[in-house]
């Protein structure tokens, strides 16, 4: 988990990047439709969290790089890399190039990641970590 005491305004990530801003606003709206989240801004990225961060964005010129944290390996057409972190934490990397990339399948995975961020997700038959 990264940490910085420097206060960076959210808008600073989008200077000269109107397409990336539109994509981020669509991504944020889709997540906020599932419930309240906290937006934490650092110099290099934007983290989206409930009790813990579960997704976020690195702003590129005209797209977003993102990850989502799940307790299982999942598949989606946008995933560019999937990493196992520890015993049962999976980090799924993806990019959003168009609003249509935020499809129903991705939204379902983001709902699941939100449960991980809520620290409420325990896979069936497994004891809490």
Placement of each model-derived feature along the sequence:
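Charge-dense, helix-prone N-terminal extensions
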Residues: 1-129
